């Protein structure tokens, strides 16, 4: 199946989504109140923290399993409630610091959608951006496997909530619609919680940068993993020409390549003229906001092996551990 990028124009002005879609607006507590004993609850990347906190405050539940892809404060709160079982593919620093326990689910990011279809939750909650006047709901800073939670075939009594984060950018690409949700959760947020743990800046990069310079030719398509080493190293390749970007995570280093003109996406064979990703880090938000050169897509598109292989001169830069 071919995936086609859709373009939705952002509408400026004083549009109030809570007034326009008032019949759908609920509080985190009201949404969490819909969870029943015995339910499987699945959430998004990034986590819908306010919903998870409200759910963690419930003491009347039994045998409830909560899937949180990358637990932050909300996931840690779930783990502290003995009536709830936290499941996650990643055990984050916040969980470790809270001495919280979770069952590890060995599922790759590109398989989260299929995992949700095979393990359908009765209640799903995904973080989204601010709804637009035409009913379009931008995905916010990530889609990852969130699309499957929203668009999967539902059984009777299944519920899907969208927690609206007003501080994430409007990113072009895939999107939802208000009709996809049973309710939209309103919570005044002061800032966007990071998706990943803090990355440290590496030192002594010269050997690594020299190797990358030789391995990444002009016109190559680049993918970068999360990590201070790869991000900083890529940002030093601004002398390159006509690079393309097809990646899992849009990070500082890739953004710097676009800002410098080194990455133009002009020669890309898949999604030409577009930077494509499924997760955006906070340091890229201002750059991505209403930037038509950048498109967000589901993980099963960004990480599809055949799609990656079809890209021109694909180069993937990721960290690895060597045990000596």
Regions found by a protein language model. Name each.
Residues 2-321:
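Conserved alpha/beta enzyme-core scaffold
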